[in-house]
Amino acid sequence: MSMIITILNGPNLNFLGKREPEIYGTETLKDIEQFCKECATRLGVRIHFYQSNYEGQLVEWIQEAIGVSAGLIINPAAYSHTSVAILDALKMFTGTKVEVHLSHIYHREAFRHHSYTSAAVDAVIAGCGGDGYWLALEYIVKRFNRNK
């Protein structure tokens, strides 16, 4: 059985391609999901890809990944700046965790410079657009293989 990596996307990411394309680009979340599936196939892993606008749903998916997924990629979107609940759920997940942001959050408004959720992850990738997901997938697979 191949390794599973869970990919979670937070609020408003379902509007990628339409919402502020000058910041987030024109790729849709479906484009990113397809790209992740192609990358996963090349890397020999499986992905579970989800999006929700609801904090509690993201927490539940993190909990469901415990003991199932070797790694977790999360783009918590605006919840990165507010959610202690997601932070606490991420702390419970013992696999490799990567936080991804499409935009460079440190080049944006000051309130976006602090991420609560990043305190519980192994790496943060910001400002690479959809390629950040590929970088996160590759990092998780390399780290898993190195620690076998």
Curated annotation (Swiss-Prot):
It comes from the Bacteria. The keyword Transferase does not apply. It is an enzyme of class 4 (lyase). GO terms for biological process: amino acid biosynthetic process; aromatic amino acid family biosynthetic process; chorismate biosynthetic process; quinate catabolic process. Pathway: Metabolic intermediate biosynthesis; chorismate biosynthesis; chorismate from D-erythrose 4-phosphate and phosphoenolpyruvate: step 3/7. The active site is at Y24 (proton acceptor), H101 (proton donor). Its EC number is 4.2.1.10. Homododecamer. This is 3-dehydroquinate dehydratase. It comes from Bartonella henselae (strain ATCC 49882 / DSM 28221 / CCUG 30454 / Houston 1) (Rochalimaea henselae).
